[in-house]
């Protein structure tokens, strides 16, 4: 049972809607407040909030139909209220999730505006996907309670939340945030304060490379997406990237990187220093007993069999699904 009771979500956009849906799916007795702090024309103050409410209701109905919601959608909706402006929506809250647009000045102004009215132990958690904590701490009078909590869309489905902390973050703020996320069924990880954290940095690199391949005329958009869904991305549902490097063999990545760098003359293809160092040491993965992970005492054959089983389970799931597909692009069922 979580000790957090009143949670405020600032911003009625897609991320705010996703977080609200996730919290309403939680069986914990949370009271949620969605707050729109954007100044709007008279008579339009609640327009964005009304739209957000409709989308949250739609999400809950879908989850209910799929058996993923324990309560009736209407019962879940009774735990959320909608507010325009800074006043009521932020009073007595223990956690504030900020989901405003990715504009540093806008987020800084928000922190300056709300801090005086918050309880000293209230946590401010920005859902930014790229902005570092130092940007927030510059304007904060209490930087020890500020963290970033980067959810991934759709936030009510994707388990991961990246929690970024800085040297100024108090242990109680980090611990409370991670504990709360675990209690509502999420998978939090902790990262040091750095622009882009983990997922956005990897995503940006991969997305730009996909667009580069498209612009070069190497493949169609549909075939690029099929390649990701049926190949690269398929494996990532079972293997993390670092584990993938180990299991494939660090020497494979080393030689592939050298070849691509020689062909393209672009620095992003250069082998990383730790890859070069491990090549020198002969730390190539399971077959040498160590790569990035230590495989001492690990039965490599058994480990590979377990991964193969997981791949086959995933493959069969896709093959027998009415909604999953390896096909890239817009599909008939989308129309």
Where do the model's predicted regions map?
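Rossmann-like NAD(P)-binding element
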Residues: 37-50, 62-123, 131
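NAD(P)-dependent Rossmann-like dehydrogenase/reductase catalytic/cofactor-binding core
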Residues: 2-5, 10, 26-28, 175, ...
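Mid-domain beta-loop-alpha active-site segment that forms a flexible
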Residues: 198-202, 206, 248-252
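Hydrophobic packing residues within well-ordered alpha-helices of enzyme cores
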Residues: 23, 114, 136-137
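Rossmann-fold dinucleotide-binding core
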Residues: 123-193, 200-201
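NAD(P)+-binding Rossmann beta1-loop-alpha1 motif at the extreme N-terminus of oxidoreductases
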Residues: 1-62, 66, 117
């Amino acid at each position: 049972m979580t000790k957090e009771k009143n949670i405020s979500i600032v911003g009625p956009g897609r991320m705010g809607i996703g977080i609200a849906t996730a919290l309403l799916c939680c069986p914990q007795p949370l009271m949620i407040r969605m707050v729109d702090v954007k100044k709007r024309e008279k008579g339009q103050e609640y327009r964005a909030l009304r739209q957000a409410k409709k989308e949250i209701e739609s999400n809950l109905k879908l989850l209910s139909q799929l058996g993923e919601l324990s309560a009736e959608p209407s019962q879940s909706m009774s735990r959320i209220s909608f507010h325009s402006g800074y006043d009521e929506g932020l009073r007595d809250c223990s956690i504030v999730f900020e989901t405003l647009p990715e504009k540093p000045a806008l987020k800084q102004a928000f922190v300056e505006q709300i801090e005086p009215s918050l309880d000293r132990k209230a946590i401010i958690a920005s859902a930014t996907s790229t902005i570092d904590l130092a940007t927030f701490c510059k304007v904060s009078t209490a930087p020890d309670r500020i963290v970033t909590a980067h959810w991934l869309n759709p936030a009510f489905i994707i388990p991961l939340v990246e929690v970024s902390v800085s040297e100024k973050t108090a242990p109680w703020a980090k611990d409370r945030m991670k504990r709360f996320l675990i209690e509502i069924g999420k998978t939090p990880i902790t990262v040091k304060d750095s622009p882009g954290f983990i997922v956005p940095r990897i995503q940006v690199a991969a997305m730009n490379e996909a667009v580069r391949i498209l612009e070069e005329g190497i493949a169609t958009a549909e075939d690029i997406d099929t390649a990701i869904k049926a190949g690269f991305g398929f494996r990532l549902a079972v293997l993390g990237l670092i584990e993938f490097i180990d299991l494939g063999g660090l020497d494979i990545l080393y030689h592939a990187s050298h070849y691509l760098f020689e062909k393209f003359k672009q620095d992003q293809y250069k082998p990383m220093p730790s890859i070069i160092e491990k090549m020198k040491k002969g730390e190539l993965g399971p077959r040498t007993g160590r790569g990035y992970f230590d495989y001492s005492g690990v039965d490599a054959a058994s480990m590979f069999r377990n991964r193969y089983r997981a791949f086959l389970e995933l493959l069969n799931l896709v093959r027998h699904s009415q909604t999953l597909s390896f096909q890239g692009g817009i599909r008939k069922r989308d129309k």
